[in-house]
Swiss-Prot record:
Homodimer. Heterodimer with RETNLB. SUPFAM superfamilies: Resistin. PANTHER family: RESISTIN, RESISTIN-LIKE GAMMA. GO terms for cellular component: extracellular space. Belongs to the resistin/FIZZ family. Probable hormone. Promotes chemotaxis in myeloid cells. This is Resistin-like gamma. Disulfide bonds join 55-108, 67-107, 76-93, 78-95, 82-97. Pfam families: Resistin. It comes from the Eukaryota.
Length: 111
């Protein structure tokens, strides 16, 4: 009987902890208010930095395709449906299949 009463009291206590409490200063309401304030004043803080992402594809015969200077590989494609490739030095695609007729590197530059 004592364990049943203790269990009941523990359950009631836990249920009280789960009941939502309305407070003006919850973290969610504070964050929401700050976001609204920032969005309302975003015209006062124009960005002075503009970046452009320019990309191109470089296709080569064989296993390797290299990007032009200043560009980095963001993806590779290989002939004969080869899906096994790696990027060497951040600028070259290397197709790893045994027989390979072409390789393509997707090269991008942030300027």
């Amino acid at each position: 009987m004592k364990t049943a009463i203790c269990s009941l009291l523990i359950c009631i206590f836990l249920l009280q902890l789960m009941v939502p409490v309305n407070t003006d200063g919850t973290l969610e309401s504070i964050v929401e208010q700050k976001v609204k304030e920032l969005l309302a004043h975003r015209d006062n803080c124009p960005s002075t930095v503009t970046k452009t992402l320019s990309c191109t594809s470089v296709k080569a015969t064989g296993r390797l395709a290299s990007c032009p200077p200043g560009m980095a590989v963001t993806g590779c494609a290989c002939g004969y449906a080869c899906g096994s490739w790696d990027i060497r030095d951040g600028t070259t695609c290397h197709c790893q299949c045994a027989v390979m007729d072409w390789a393509t590197a997707r090269c991008c530059q942030l300027s």
